[in-house]
C-alpha cells in the first residue's frame, strides 16, 4: 500500500482493520470509537451516509461491526478523501464503503432525496468564532465549522434520510441546545441521548445521540 510523506498505518485492533493517517493531520479519537459502538444496531442490508468522513474511521469500523450493505463517506478535503480511499482499499472494503470528495451541502447533486436508511456523523464541534484555532488547515476544517455548520449537517440529514431513518451523531454537551433546535426545525426527533463522562465525578464531555426522521419518540436520557 502506497503511503505519502508523513503518513502511517495504524492497527484498529478490531478484526484486523487498519487505517492510514497523517502524522501532522487530524487523527481519529475516542469519540469516533464511541459513536461506532453506539450505532451497532444498524440493520443488515441497510445503506448509509458518513458525513464528514475524514480518515474514514467510522465507515471502516461500521463495516466491521455491522452487516450494513453500503456506506458512502463524504469528505470535502480532496487530499483527506484520497487518503481515506486508500484505507478502504487497504481493508478490502471497496464493495461496501465508497468515498466521495464533496461538500455535504452539495449532496443533492449526487443522491436522490430520502435515499438512506441511516446517517452517521462526527461533525466539527466548534463554531468558527469560538475556541482556539489551529494553523494546520486540515485540522482547522475538522474541528471548526468552516465548510459546513451544524445547521448544514442536520439539514442535509433531513433531506437524505428515509422516513423513520436514523441519524447518529456525537457532539459536545455545550452544543446540545443548538442540536435540539436544529433537529426540531428539520422534523427529526431525538430518540436517545447519552452523556459520556471522561472520569468519575467529571462533567460529561461527549454526547452520542440517535435521532429518528419524522417520527415522534419519547427521548431517553442516560
Walk through the language-model features, giving the residues of each.
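Class I SAM-dependent transferase core
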Residues: 2-42
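Conserved beta-strand segments of alpha/beta enzyme cores
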Residues: 18, 70, 96-98, 189-192
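Short loop/edge segments at beta-strand edges and connector loops
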Residues: 21, 101-102, 171, 194
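Residue-level signal for inorganic ion chemistry
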Residues: 35, 122, 153, 211
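Conserved SAM/SAH cofactor-binding pocket of Class I
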Residues: 38-111, 115-121, 126-132
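Mobile active-site "lid"/loop adjacent to the S-adenosyl-L-methionine
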Residues: 123-152
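Conserved Class I SAM-dependent methyltransferase catalytic core
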Residues: 147-197, 204
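Single conserved hydrophobic/aromatic residue that forms the stacking wall/gate
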Residues: 213-222
Amino acid at each position: 500500500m502506497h503511503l505519502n510523506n508523513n503518513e502511517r498505518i495504524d492497527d484498529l485492533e478490531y478484526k484486523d482493520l487498519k487505517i492510514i493517517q497523517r502524522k501532522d493531520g487530524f487523527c481519529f479519537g475516542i469519540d469516533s470509537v464511541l459513536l461506532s459502538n453506539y450505532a451497532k444496531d444498524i440493520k443488515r442490508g441497510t445503506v448509509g451516509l458518513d458525513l464528514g468522513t475524514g480518515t474514514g474511521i467510522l465507515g471502516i469500523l461500521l463495516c466491521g461491526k455491522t452487516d450494513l450493505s453500503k456506506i458512502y463517506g463524504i469528505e470535502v478535503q480532496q487530499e483527506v478523501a484520497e487518503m481515506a480511499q486508500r484505507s478502504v482499499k487497504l481493508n478490502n472494503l471497496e464493495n461496501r464503503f465508497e468515498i466521495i470528495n464533496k461538500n455535504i451541502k452539495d449532496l443533492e447533486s449526487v443522491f436522490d432525496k430520502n435515499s438512506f436508511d441511516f446517517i452517521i456523523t462526527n461533525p466539527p464541534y466548534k463554531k468558527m468564532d469560538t475556541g482556539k484555532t489551529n494553523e494546520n488547515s486540515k485540522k482547522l476544517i475538522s474541528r471548526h465549522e468552516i465548510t459546513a455548520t451544524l445547521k448544514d449537517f442536520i439539514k442535509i440529514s433531513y433531506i437524505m434520510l428515509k422516513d423513520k431513518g436514523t441519524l447518529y451523531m456525537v457532539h459536545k454537551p455545550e452544543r446540545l441546545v443548538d442540536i435540539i433546535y436544529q433537529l426540531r426545525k428539520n422534523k427529526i426527533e431525538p430518540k436517545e441521548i447519552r452523556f459520556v463522562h471522561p472520569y468519575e465525578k467529571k462533567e460529561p464531555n461527549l454526547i452520542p445521540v440517535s435521532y429518528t426522521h419524522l417520527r415522534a419518540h419519547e427521548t431517553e436520557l442516560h
